[in-house]
Amino acid sequence: MGQGQPVIARRAVLASAAALALPACEGKREITGALLGASTGRGHLLRDLRAIRDAAQPPTSKQTRVVIAGGGVAGLAAARALRQLGIEDFVMLELEDAAGGNSRGGEIAGIACPLGAHYLPVPGDTAREVQHFLEEAGLRKRVSGRWVYDERYLCHAPQERLFFSGAWQDGLLPLQDVGAATLAQYERFSRLVARAQQQGAYTMPVAVTPPSAAHLGLDAMTFDAWLVRERLDDAHLRWYLDYCCRDDYGTGLHTVSAWAGIHYFASRHGFHAPGSQADTASASEEEHGVLTWPEGNAWLTRKLGDGLGERLRPGHVVTRIREGRHGVTVDAYDAGARTTQRWQAQHCIVALPIFVAERTIESPPALLADRARVMRYAPWAVVNMHLREPLRDRPGAAPSWDNVVYGSRGLGYVDARHQSLDPRPGPTVLSWYAPLAEGERALLLSRSWADWLHVAQAELAQAHPDLRERVTRVEVARYGHAMAIPAPGTLARTAAGLPHSSRLSYAHSDWAGYSVFEEAFTAGHRAAMRVA
C-alpha cells in the first residue's frame, strides 16, 4: 500500500478479463465472482427524492416512540443504549438488507470474511462507552485488578508484514537496508509525535476534549505541508505515513490535515522508532493490540443487533424526516414491497451520513447544510478472494494477518484463517482493500469483479505470482462514500458541535470528521442518552 503506482490500463484489464472467461481454452480453473456492497440502486434513489415521493402510494402511518434512521454502527449503538434505558418502543430503518453499515461481513465457501472494517484497536479510557460494550460482549474482563482481553480475539502473532526489497519483513515500517538517514528521520518523527502527545490531548472520541489552538493550527494545513515544514522528506517514512492515512482515512497525506495525520498515532499507540526502548516495550503490551475476527467488525455489529427482531427494518430507504411541534414524521421507501411507509414518533435519531441527512431532513438546519456542503468522502472496494490452497511464499517474515506490498496503491490483504487455531493449511479467503481517489468513484460502477481481480493480481504480483492459479471465487464489496475525509478545516467545523433540536438527535461518525468504530459507537450511544 503506497504511493502512486499507476492504475492498470483499461485495455489491459479487459484483455485479462477475457482470459478469465475462457478457462477451458487455457487449461485454467474456472473462477466465479460477484459484485456486492452498498446497494447503489437504493442509495441513488436519494438523488431524486421528489420522484420517489410523488410516485409512492399514499403512505400508511405507524406509531413508535423513537425512529432510528440508519443501521450502521452508530444506529446499532443507539438501539443498544435505548434498550439499556428501558426504551423498547423504537424502529430502525436501514437501506441495506442487513444492519452494520461499513462493518458488515460475508462468507465464501463456508469461510467468513469482512465486507468492510476488519479490526478494532483496543480502545483507550476516553472511549468508555466502547469499553463497556466490549465487557458486555465478553471480550474483556477484570483479572487481579487489571483489564484482560480474550486472547482468542486479539490478533495473533505475527500481526503484519511488508514485502519490501524483494522479501517479506516483520512490521510495516520499511527497515531493510534503508540507511542511517532514514532511521534518523524515523527517530525525529517519533520525537515529534511524543511532543504532540505531551502538549495536548489527542483523544478518541475527539469530542471528549475541545481542540486547542495548536490543534486548530495543525488542522489548517495538510499533513504533507507539515512534513515539509518539519523537513521530514524521507521517501520510506512518507510512504509509511501515507499508507497509515489511507488505511484510516481513505486518502493520503496530501489530502488529510496535519492534525489528522498526527492524531492517527498520538490518539493510540504513538510512533516508536525501530530499536527504541518504547518500541521494545510496546511490542508485548496488550493495550496496543487489535481485536479482529474472520468476518471483521461484523462480529461486533451482530452482537449489537442481537435481539432487535422486527424492530430492525432492512431494505428501507428513509426519504423524508419532518420535525413538527408535537413529534417527528419519517417516511421510508420499502424496497421489497415497493411502497412508502410513514412513521409518527416522538423522536428521531438521525444515524445517517451527513450528506444523506441533509437531503432527507425537511428544512435542514444551517449547521447540517454547511457541513454537508464541504464534506468529502473516500470511495472503497474490498476484494474478497477465495483460495483453494495457500499461496507460495517469498523469503522472509512468515505469513501474517496483514500483508502489505510496498509501493502499491492498495492497502494489502488480511487472511481470514489467521485467527484459526487449526495448524493445517487449507482453503482461505484473502480480503484485499483498495481505497480510490475521489475522482475514481465511477470505477465502482464500471469495473466488473474480473477487473478487480486483475487489479489485485497486478498489485500483488511481486509477492504472489501464483495468486491467479489459486483463486476460485471473487466477491467485491463497493462503497461510494465509505468514510469521511478529515481534510484541513474539519476539526474546526467539528468543534461547532451538533445541530440543536428537541426531537432530532444526530449520530454518525461523520460528525467527528473521520470514520472509525469508536467515534460512531460513541455518537450513537450519546444520541440515545439525549432521547432519555
Model-derived regions: residue spans:
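Extreme N-terminal leader/targeting segments of oxidoreductases
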Residues: 2, 6-65, 84
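Conserved flavin/dinucleotide-binding core of flavoenzymes
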Residues: 27-55, 165, 171-173, 392-532
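N-terminal Rossmann-like FAD-binding beta1-loop-alpha1 element of flavoenzymes
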Residues: 65-91
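Active-site rim elements
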Residues: 115-123, 209-216, 286-293, 370-374, ...
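Mid-domain catalytic core of redox enzymes
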Residues: 310, 314-429, 463
